[in-house]
């Protein structure tokens, strides 16, 4: 009997697509259909691609478009980080946060909003899930099957220089492309694991707006999340070990962003050292030394 790659998978195995509402159900039907049967390998593949994120999908589609015989292997979600826990959901939140900022700035144009801004965070997140599900068809298993690609769902194991095994099936190939990407790093910060934390893989599953949010790391993703949640109304602390936010960018440009984020209410703690997380009766505290000042927040 052929082994189904997803025979042991359930929605609970994917915390990045919770809650399992109609939109996330539609997403999963596209990027990880639970009823999918892996095809029988046919002959020798010109290219086996391991990982169906942005790089893997482009490689697979490009090779197939040139007439190559392609196998595409993905053990989690087609579309990878960009579709599921990166570019798409973050930009949906950024757009909602920008709308908040526009309403708050409306007075300078003579537009009065007497009742101020009211944030419906569950509706913001539902919109994100709806948009993500709509886009997911472009990265779907069945779309790439329609391109003539053999799509396998499961974990790949290289057993020889020209052989990969997946759920009892043997695939022979001339070339292989490993495009498996990365996972969030669990930082060795005292108290972090005990207190619990979010990553880019789980933050987009929130259904309630956090009253307080600490963001560790002020690169592009950290800044996006910090500013968005601050505009939604969370009390946000952004911690960066380097001398300023966006440490890999031009300092003048980063300084402009820094000023705007402070205007949005983000508390910046740069040159952060001796970071510690403490779970106390009144909630989770972040203790950090920033520019020689000790903060307990």
Which role does the model predict for each range below?
Residues 2-45, 62-68, 73-209, 242-246, ...:
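Glycine-rich flavin
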Residues 44-72, 214, 222-232:
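N-terminal Rossmann-like FAD-binding beta1-loop-alpha1 element of flavoenzymes
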Residues 50, 130-131, 216, 248:
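Residue-level marker of alpha-helix boundaries and capping positions
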Residues 53-58, 81-82, 88, 183, ...:
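Gly/Ser/Thr-rich beta-alpha loop segments that engage phosphate groups in nucleotides
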Residues 121-122, 237-242, 269-271:
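Short beta-strands and strand-loop turn motifs
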Residues 207-249:
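Rossmann-like NAD(P)H-binding beta-loop-alpha module
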Residues 297:
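Conserved NAD(P)+-binding/catalytic subdomain of aldehyde/semialdehyde dehydrogenases
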